[in-house]
Amino acid sequence: NVKNICLSGGYALNCVANFKLRQSLPKDINLYVEPVSHDAGTAIGAAKLLYHEMRMLEGITDDPIIPQTTVKYGFQNHYPATYDFARFKKTKVTNKDVAKKLSENKIVALFKDRSELGPRALGNRSILFNPNNSKAKDIVNKVKNRESYRPFAGTILHEDCKQYFDMNVLDESPFMMYAVKAKNYSLKGIRHVDGT
């Protein structure tokens, strides 16, 4: 009679296992994978439970915990925090500007708005590159000082995700908690050896 399953903890960060579990469950069972699946997520859950008990609410909000609920920073905060690592000048950048840089195979570091909570880069603290550029991931791995076998995730508009990825039983993966197969093999810059 279970209709809702929630995964949390370190094992919930296994994107491949999460997707296989979602595929194996009947469609009428909801699977929620906590995007802050580490100690900070436990603290958030404890705070929500205490809030629920103190307020004597009938139910906790249906709103998901969005891993971008922290303080919003402006340029005056960004500049001193990054001055020792990079020199830059203040410029207003639009999504179109970022898209143009990516189309020119430039690597773009996004540092904007609210900090993110959890282990995944979700757009406010992200390193972006053209997913068709197979050499870019080596550069990003070097910048991040990480192993070459580590996978990358694509960022895509919701309405376009099924065109590029085999979402199967999923409608979306907003917090990078599922590994899905890439349909378009031109995405060589982000496609992992297993096709995800």
Q: Whereabouts are the PLM-identified features?
A:
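Flexible beta->alpha loop and helix N-cap segments adjacent to enzyme active/binding sites
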Residues: 14, 18-196
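Short glycine-rich phosphate-binding loop at a beta-alpha junction
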Residues: 2-10, 109
